[in-house]
Amino acid sequence: MRGPVLSRLLTAAALAPSGHNTQPWRFSVEGERITILPDPSRRLPVVDPDDHALWISLGCAVENLVVAARGEGYHAEVDDTGLDGEDPVLTVHLRPGGTGDTDGNGLYSAISQRQSTRRSYDGRAVPVADLGRLEGASRQEGVGFHLFTDPGRIEPLIEWVEEGNRRQFSDPAFLDELIRWIRFNPGEIRKLQDGLTHAAMGLPSVPRWLGRFIMGKLVTPGSQARSAARAIRSSAALMLFTSERPDPRGWVSLGRSFERVALTATTLDIKHAHMNMPCEVPALREELRRHLELGAAHPLLLLRLGYAKPMPRSPRRPLEEVVVKGSR
């Protein structure tokens, strides 16, 4: 495989979303085999103690790699048998023979445009046909996809999101972990190339000491709950992803499904943003599962959909920081 092609594939994979933009992945390349490994130094032990969000992010990276490979004229075969080992990994085998259609359904181009857009939306409804395209893109074995457009069904979900915010922002450990990953000024962004930028969080550019003060004193559980409720009510819909399996294989499958939906939404100029709070608090997640009559499925990703202007893009670390040499 030519170097420029490999670089484009790895860049596409590394543009996947991740909790707090931790970018918790490493890539090992041997010939036409790419191994995707978790980076344990980038775990979120407070908000994601079982690592389900980490593995969802790796699933998103895999899906980006598959989409990019197809666009570059390669067929990508995903081998998830490595997830059964003591140190789980994913492997993607590449061989010539993909479509070579660099923008077939627009997904390849959408990789660099996709973003979590955390601003208020304009309230416009998403056409039924476009919602159908999102549902079609979500199909993945073991993954459930649920759309909510009726205000009567959305309002109860808002209450869970509000309560999730109140519980999380009342937890000093949660707040400390969040602050650790906020980049409060351009200097921090340039130096670290990861985390949640001050612009994405709706904060001014300030020194870290002042940012910590703002987050600790001025951002309250109540204000966060109210802000989340306003954001959802400005949106056209909510979408929920569930997994039948509470293990890396199930979480990776959910990540692949979500990333296809996110890329498809991007081609339709539909924005999305995470509202995961009730999925991140175990007691609320169980209440949500019972309320929605999900059976044994686990609700893990809740997002809002709608239309809005884009926000500044989140940074990414350079490839030399995420590509490891040789076998693991």
Ranges and model annotations:
Residues 1-328:
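Acidic, surface-exposed loops and disordered segments
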